[in-house]
C-alpha cells in the first residue's frame, strides 16, 4: 500500500503540509513532513493518511518554485508522474510527485474533500449564507448609508443617495449650521468607497476642526483617517550623501488623509507634495474661508483650485450662499465646474432671470393660484412643454384637489430638473427642516471675587492684561498664584453645585475654555460633593473620551454632568441632554454656535436651557449681553453672526475693554437692527426650489423608513452570532440589546479586525449606539461584519462537508451532492458592476441520477434534516464514494454552464436599462440645464459600454460542496 517516495497528507494535522513516505513495514509507516520539519510513525491499521493525487487541469508547484499546468497523470510502480506545461515559459515538463512543493495546500472544494480536509456541515451552511448575504448587500440601494452611527434624518439621506451614486460627484453642500453637512459628506464618501470609485481621499479643514473630523469619521463611519502635519511629514524628509533631496512624498503613505488648510497655505513645499500625490476625492470643510475676488484670489483658494482641477470628485462644505454674498458663492461653484461658472457677471444675470421662477414655486408650494407673470416665468423655462392645460388645472376652482396636487408636483419636478444649480448645490435651512427645539437663555450674574479684581489690577499696572485674562480670570489668577487654587473662591462653582443638586434627574453638559479648568471642576464635583461626573478634553485619547461619553449617556447609573473643554467636545453630540452650562463664554459667535450645537441637533426632544454664569460689570457680561441682545445668538441660530462680528468687532472691542463705557445700549440697538436687516435679506434670498430639491420630501422620508426597517434585522443578528462562533469569539449577552465579544485562544485568525485585545461591546440597536459611543453599532456595512464575510468567503472555511440525511422515504446509502457555484465577473471596481452582477451563489442539488432538485428542496428545509458526521466516517465516505462524487461534480458543471447565459442576460438587461435611463435623463436635461457636465455624460456612456462588455465575460467557479448520504435514522 505504501511505497517509499509517495506523497501523503495527515488527515488530523493538515498544517504539517505534504508528507513523504520514508519507511514502511507490515505494521507501521514512517512519514516525513519537510515543510514542518516533523516526522510521524503511524500504525498501518489506523493511519489517518490520505494519498495526494492531482488531476488534469490543476496547477501544481514544484519544490524548485516553478509551476506546472497538469495535462496528464501517469502512475508507474506506485509512483505518480505529472506531465504538462510550465506556467512561466509554456515549455513541456515532467514533475514526479517526489519533487512536489512540500507546502502544498488544497483550495478547490473537491481537492479538500478527497484529501480529508473536510469541514463541519454547519460551516458549509454559514459559508453559503455568507455568500448569499454578500450578494444581497452588493445590490442593496442602502449600502453605504445604513451603517452610520447617527439618527436617520431624511434630508441628509436624500443628499447622500443623490450625490453618492454619481460618477465623480462635484457638489457644494451648504446646509445651515446644525443640519449635518459633515454627515452628508461622510455618507457620500462611504458610498464612493464601497463602490470602488474612490480609494484615496484628502480632507482639508481649518486647523481647529482636524480632530473633529478625525473623530466623526471614525465614530460615525468606521473610517480611519490619518492626521498629517509638519511633524509627521518631516519624518519622510531625507537627503543623500551629497545633500540632494531624496525625500519620499509623505502624502503617498496613507489612503485617507486629513490636513489643515492653514498649514498647507503657509508651507509651499508641503502643498507641492499634496499636488504631486494622486487623489480620487477632495473634501474641503469651511470652504467659504477661501478668500476670492476677481482680481486677487487668496493663496488658499488658488491651491484648492489647482487641486480640484486634478481630482475627479470634489465636495465643498460651506456656509449658506446668502451668508457668503454672491461673489464668494460664485467662487465656490467655479471650483466645481470652471467651464460652467466662468464669468461672474453672467452668473449674476442668470440668477436674476431665475428669481421669478423661484417665486412662482413658492406659490405652488403654498397651493395658491399662479399670477400671470408667474405663469410666463414657468412657461419660458419649460418652453418645450405645453403648460397651458396645467395652469388651468392649478388656477381653476373647479379642479379636484387631487388633480391640482398632481399637476403641482409635476411642475415642481420639471422645474427642479432645470434649476440653475440644483445638481451642484444642496442647501437645507432650519425653516425647511422640522424637528428643532426652542432655545431658552438664562443669564446668571455673579459678583467678581476680589482675588480676580486684584489680579487684573496688578496685571494692568504691569501693562499686560489681555482679552483672555479678562474673559477667563481664573487662568490669570492661577498663573500669578501657582500655590493657590482659584476653585476655592470662584462663585461660579457654588452656583454650579447648587444648580446640579436642584436638577439631579437631568443630564447637564458644562463647557469650559481649557482642559485644566474642566479637570479642576470635575475633581471638585466628584471628590467634594460626590456628584456623578465625567470629564472630557483634548488631552484624553479617543478611547478615554468614548468611555466618558458612555458614562454620561447611561440613564440610571451614569454621570449627571459631563464637563468638557471647548476643543474636547468637537465632533461629539449629546442631544439626550438639554441643559448646557457655558462656564466660559466663547469669544466669537461661530464658537458659541458650535458649543450650543452639541445639544441643538435634530433628534433633541426637549427645549435647550442655556445657562451662562458671568461676573457683573465684566468683559464676560458685555460679551454675553451683545450675543443675546445684539445677535439673539443664544435663543436662535445666527447664520449672520460672523458677518456682524466682522462689521461691529472693532467697536465691540472698545466696550469689552471698558465694560462701563457710555453708549453700550445704543450699540446693542444698532447691532440688533442690522441683525434683523440681514435676517430679512436671508429670508428674501431663500430659493424655495433649491430647498425642495435638497430636502427630498416624501422620497427622503421613505428612504429613512427603509433603513430603519433594517435596524435590528434578525437575519443580521443570527448571521453575526454564527459568524462570531465560527471565528472563535466568546459572546456574553449583557441584556439591554448589547453583547460583549471577546477574543479566545482558539480563533481562526490571531487578530480579528474591530475586536479590542480584551473585549468589545456591540449592539444592533441604533438608539443605544447613539447614546453609547463605546459600543460598536453593527450593521451589514460595519467592518466587523464585512471583514467576517470576507474571512469566510475568501478562505477555505466550509468549502467541503459531508452530512447524513435522515429520511425514511429514501433508500439508505442514497448519495446527494449539494454544489455551490459562484457566477462572477473580474471587472475594475470603479465600474461598480456588483449592482447588476455581484458574486452570485448558485445552488445545485443533485440526486444520484443527476437530476437537479434545488428548486424543489430548499436549503433551509434540507438543513433541518441533516445530521453531522464525525471526521473519521466523513473521510471513509469520501474515499468509498469518490468515483460517484466525481461523476456528480461533472454533471453539476454541465448544469451551471447551462444556467450561465440566463444570468448574464439578466445582468446585461439590468445594467443597460439602468445606465441607459440615466444617460437619457442627463442628455435630455443637458439641453435645458447647463449644469449637466459633458464629461459626466461621456463617462456614463463609457461606463455603460464597458459594463456590458465585462458582464458578457462573466464565468463560474465551484466554491463549495457538500456530500449527503441518506439513512433511515
Curated annotation (Swiss-Prot):
InterPro entries: Helicase_ATP-bd, Helicase_C-like, Helicase_RapA, P-loop_NTPase, RapA_C, SNF2-like_sf, SNF2/RAD54-like_C, SNF2_N. One of its GO terms (molecular function) is hydrolase activity, acting on acid anhydrides. Residues 162-339 form the Helicase ATP-binding domain. A motif (DEAH box) lies at residues 285-288. Its EC number is 3.6.4.-. The keyword Transferase does not apply. It is an enzyme of class 3 (hydrolase). One of its GO terms (biological process) is regulation of DNA-templated transcription. SUPFAM superfamilies: P-loop containing nucleoside triphosphate hydrolases. Keywords: Activator, ATP-binding, DNA-binding, Helicase, Hydrolase, Nucleotide-binding, Transcription, Transcription regulation. ATP binds at residues 175-182. Residues 492-663 form the Helicase C-terminal domain. Disulfide bonds: none annotated. Transcription regulator that activates transcription by stimulating RNA polymerase (RNAP) recycling in case of stress conditions such as supercoiled DNA or high salt concentrations. Probably acts by releasing the RNAP, when it is trapped or immobilized on tightly supercoiled DNA. Does not activate transcription on linear DNA. Probably not involved in DNA repair. Belongs to the SNF2/RAD54 helicase family. RapA subfamily. Interacts with the RNAP. Has a higher affinity for the core RNAP than for the holoenzyme. Its ATPase activity is stimulated by binding to RNAP. This is RNA polymerase-associated protein RapA. The lineage of its organism: Bacteria, Pseudomonadati, Pseudomonadota, Gammaproteobacteria, Pasteurellales. The gene is rapA.
